[in-house]
Design a protein with these regions (language model features):
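Conserved Rossmann-fold cofactor-binding substructure of NAD(P)-dependent oxidoreductases
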Residues: 61-77, 84, 88
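Short beta-strand element of Class I
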Residues: 29-31
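Rossmann-fold cofactor-recognition segment
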Residues: 49-64
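N-terminal Rossmann-fold NAD(P) dinucleotide-binding loop
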Residues: 13-17
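Helix N-cap at the beta1-alpha1 junction of Rossmann-like dinucleotide-binding domains, i.e.
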Residues: 36-39
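C-terminal catalytic/substrate-binding lobe primarily of soluble NAD(P)-dependent oxidoreductases
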Residues: 156-287
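Rossmann-fold NAD(P)-binding glycine/threonine-rich loop
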Residues: 107-134
Length: 287
């Protein structure tokens, strides 16, 4: 492949960057870019001497299309790997269009001022990317991502037809903390506190947050409580798996997590509505 520009330097980005460096024959060179360049420099220092991949760093505001275009033109990557926040998907896609650079992300776009995520905003770019002769690969994490690959493989190689898909996302880890999120806390809490939905009979069925609970005995992990959530791969699978009748997505949560989340909700800390605090406007969830 040659060179990749990786935007973001949080937990998910760190894992992806480590994996890129383990495959230096593919990722010969990477540039790590983030609003806080010191995080990029720290990760670069940690990785140097452990990989043949050449690593550079850069500062960029991923909300600013002009800054992104300038960075892409300077780095000249073969592909941009977007591991920033979902709010920034569209600005990064715009920059890739302007520079005719291939694009990959792991989570679909959602507006910062609305706790709602769906593919419609990004799917609207399909013709633009086709006309530019470049590829945009959306939702290339585990879920979404691997879940879609598993479903497509099963349809092609194992089944004549698939009518029902249930995706069960289980975190069996326990590090002893009473409350911790699986990924970016702000995005995770927005996702969990939003209304759920699933696809059935050709239309969407909406549920209240955490309304539908099931118990499942996960091999190697044990019995866990899981709750129905909306998730983006439901949209893409409903579109691309012919004959599908129902698709649902469940995620496991421990009681301690849910208790702390409820406390945060009760005191207004999960709200995305701006409020005034000590003369400044803040968003409680980000605070």
């Amino acid at each position: 492949m040659g060179k990749a520009l990786i935007i973001g330097c949080g937990g998910v980005a760190s894992v992806a960057i480590h994996k890129c460096c383990q495959n230096s024959e593919v990722f010969e060179e990477i540039c790590i870019a983030s609003r806080t360049v010191s995080k990029c420099d720290a990760l670069k220092e940690k990785l140097q001497g452990t990989t043949k991949t050449k690593i550079t760093t850069a500062q960029v505001n991923a909300d600013n299309v002009d800054e992104l275009i300038a960075l892409i033109n300077d780095v000249k990557p073969d592909v941009v790997l977007n591991l920033a926040l979902p709010y920034q998907d569209l600005t990064i896609m715009d920059a890739c269009l302007a520079t005719k650079t291939h694009y990959i992300d792991t989570a679909n776009y959602e507006p910062e001022d609305t706790a709602k995520f769906e593919y419609s905003w990004q799917w609207a770019y399909r013709e633009k990317f086709e006309e530019a002769g470049i590829t945009a690969l959306l939702g290339s994490g585990f879920d979404p991502g691997v879940t879609g690959v598993f479903s497509a493989y099963a349809l092609k190689h194992e089944f004549d037809e698939i009518n029902y898909i249930d995706i069960l996302d289980c975190n069996g880890g326990d590090h002893g903390y009473p409350f911790a999120t699986n990924f970016n806390p702000e995005i995770n809490i927005r996702e969990v506190s939003a209304k759920g939905s699933y696809w059935e009979g050709g239309h969407w069925v909406e549920t209240e947050p955490m309304e539908i609970k099931r118990e499942y005995n996960f091999e190697g992990v044990g019995e866990k409580d899981m709750y129905l959530l909306h998730h983006e791969e439901i949209e893409s699978l409903a579109l691309n798996i012919p004959g599908i009748k129902r698709i649902r997505f469940f995620m496991t949560f421990g009681q301690s997590y849910l208790t702390h989340l409820k406390c945060l909700e009760n005191v207004g800390m999960t709200s995305i509505e701006p409020i005034m605090y000590e003369g400044k406007e803040i968003i409680p969830l980000q605070f």
